[in-house]
């Protein structure tokens, strides 16, 4: 009879630990991160009264998956994981002059597309 009480106690403690850990996690999806959607955001540094300057900001997607063997054979330096991502970039923009003579892009529409920060 004592062995049943020990098993019941172990099960009860395990259940309580599980419930405690479940309630300690914030509400929402486990994979969701605090990153807003891709949209226009005012650039406070370059904006002036009456002439706001906007830039695209926010999250798109990224993923990683195993590189197919057929593709690895064609690589000069084979890698096991292939990653793919898209960035929040300007779909349309206009040129604007701020602070006298500094030319910047004033974004007018955003979308998720190829990341350009590494393509100089």
Swiss-Prot record:
- Quote the subcellular location field of this record: Secreted
Entry keywords, A to Z: Disulfide bond, Glycoprotein, Hormone, Secreted, Signal
* UniProt-listed Pfam families: Hormone_6
List of glycosylated residues: 80, 106
Broad class of where this protein is predominantly found: secreted
SMART domains reported for this sequence? GHA (SM00067)
Q: Please give the Gene3D superfamilies that the UniProt record associates with this protein.
A: Cystine-knot cytokines
The SS bond pairs are 35-59, 38-88, 56-110, 60-112, 87-115
User: What family is this protein classified in?
Assistant: Belongs to the glycoprotein hormones subunit alpha family.
Biological role: Shared alpha chain of the active heterodimeric glycoprotein hormones thyrotropin/thyroid stimulating hormone/TSH, lutropin/luteinizing hormone/LH, follitropin/follicle stimulating hormone/FSH and choriogonadotropin/CG. These hormones bind specific receptors on target cells that in turn activate downstream signaling pathways.
Self-association and partners? Heterodimer. The active hormones thyrotropin, lutropin, follitropin and choriogonadotropin are heterodimers composed of CGA, a common alpha chain described here and a unique beta chain which confers their biological specificity to the hormones: TSHB for thyrotropin, LHB for lutropin, FSHB for follitropin and choriogonadotropin subunit beta/CGB for choriogonadotropin.
| Name of the protein described by the UniProt record | Glycoprotein hormones alpha chain
Instruction: Kindly list the organism's lineage.
Output: Eukaryota, Metazoa, Chordata, Craniata, Vertebrata
